[in-house]
Amino acid sequence: LMNCAQLNLEPNTPQELAYLIPYKDECQFQIGYKGFLQLVYRSGIVSSFNADVVYRAEVENGMFEYRKGITPTITHKVDLLHPEAREGELIAAYAACTLKGGGEGMLRLVDKKDIERAQKTSASLAANKKYGKDSPWISSPEAMWMKTAIKRLAAWLPQTEMLAMAVDLDDKSERGESQLVLP
């Protein structure tokens, strides 16, 4: 609960900002993607933020394009006449933001291999599978993919104490490590 209070994220609410999750003999604090978004906005660093997932059908139908480079760009079109393109196999997620004060936007794209690596190192996913419990990686994969992209982008943003603490606490939760905070 100390972590919730320090980050000012109320757990287990309909807002889905953060969660208190039983893990072994302690309670783990886990930040949802909406909680990370709130922390990024609260930092005062960004003026706009966007995150989404990409489905295979979107790429195959020319609805998604990613260009790498010094100034990477994403074009993600939505076809309202074919909503089925937003279903099926997930292949990537991204997070993008515009920094306050102008300058170039920032963008991070994580592909399926990156996501699978994040899943493999997730102690909570392994524990949930072992004990037959539902994991957000299973029940809400889109949210977990976006959260991974947001965390990757947050690591590249100018760091505030709150943002750095949030990433550290969530990483510890994913690895199943103690999140004990010393005063």
Regions found by a protein language model. Name each.
Residues 2-162:
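Binding-interface segments
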Residues 148, 158-183:
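Single-stranded nucleic-acid nicking/binding segments centered on His-rich, glycine/basic loops
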Residues 1, 26, 174-178:
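Short alpha-helical interface elements
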